Amino acid sequence: MLPAQAAPDANKLLFLPLVQKNYPPPPTVFGAETHSPSTSRIQQAVQANLYWLRYSTISWAAIEPVRTDPPTYHWETVDEAGLEAAARAGFKTILVVKHIPDWAQKKSGVTCGPIAQDSMDEFSQFVRALVQRYSPYPYYVRYWEFGNEPDVDPSLVPPDSVFGCWGDKKDKYYGGGYYADMLKWAYPPLKEASPDSSLIIGGLLLDCDPQDPPPGQATGCKPAKFFEGILNNQGANYFDVVAFHTYATYYQGSILDEDDPKWDSRGGQVSGKVNFLRQVMSDYGVNKPILMSEVALLCSEQDCVTPGASFLDSQADFVVSVNARAWGLGLLGSVWYTLEESSWRQSGLFIQATPKPGYHALVFMAKELQDATLGSEITQYNGLRGYEFHLPAKRVWILWSPDGVTGQQISLPSGVKAVYDKFGNPLTPVQNSLWVVHPTYIELAK
């Protein structure tokens, strides 16, 4: 996974990832965000066979708090040990760049907001220094995400919000054009410093579909026009990957994704947002890979203090279904938020040091599909969703009910070798028939 052209210091030890059979396995969509890539966290990510590791350790405000000439950068504020550990383990690290120093803010006091026009040159210098430092050995960062959910107006969040808050609700394109101006300053130095690096636009929140707003939506879903604003201002030449975020909700015992009224006309939270982004790109003659840089199943507000067994089981269902769907939709990756325990509505895959069922489901999925390639979507079972995956010695079907509640009895195809539940426990069909509601793996002869 480490770049072949990188040349470490001859006096230093180069840690390469374990490579089986003298060639690396094909990339998968599996990923997660971590707030601290500690030794234990890295081990958990390795066990889950993650490919992507997203990490928000870069704060321009912390690195360059004071404007000086020449610039003074405080790299000691960056968790370099964590970045090195992630590289040593072979992960593709997505490094999130955010937080604007006081002296560079377009809106005074708003750390999460846009950069002032007269500070873009300093930002460009910072990007060059950043990429020059963290793209070579021993960090090998190749994916740089600029901002986090920038399609939010600063009036809607605290000034130091984790949201990107580049939004402008008075603008036709909600501020996307000005974000494109920033990309024009960031992209050239990034590519000059590391030609094989990729610039990712900050993961878009995409609150709802502007072409089909749900009833009572006061904004008319205008924030989702942010992406079009980027393209309308010729921003397509200044980024490599589109990123978006999506959070399904556990509601009254079921998974609210496909039926979410904000995106149901396009197929739900995941499929709908992907469909929307691809349509907007098509309208502008653009074709870029898409990354789901945050995703999770959230508990409902009243169930968040102590999540029940039903929520935890549904979350495990969603881990499998959303990764299968991301793979089937051709996404670059699917990054779960977060690997460790999260204060955000029980989204994390651990409770302190104890793995949730969702983590166990991810571990089995990664093991079952190791070295797999995508086959075709499975559509013959009305009411179920599924995909076929190809491996050297077998085919694997994954089937599930989209709401996690409404199941269906199916007749199995010929050539079935084994059937497993989402955790890898064997299931026994009865007279070649099987009840499917939760994610189910069906192994078939090649």
Model regions and ranges:
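Noncatalytic carbohydrate-binding groove/subsite architecture in carbohydrate-active enzymes
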Residues: 174-319, 329
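C-terminal beta-strand-rich structural cap/linker in extracellular carbohydrate-active enzymes
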Residues: 427-446
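Conserved functional hotspot residues at active sites or interaction interfaces
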Residues: 17
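Conserved, mostly hydrophobic/aromatic
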Residues: 53, 86, 130, 144, ...
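Aromatic/acidic polysaccharide-binding cleft in carbohydrate-active enzymes
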Residues: 295-366, 377-382
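N-terminal substrate-binding region of glycoside hydrolase catalytic domains
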Residues: 23-146, 150-174, 204-206, 218, ...
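Carbohydrate-binding surface patches
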Residues: 380-415, 422-423
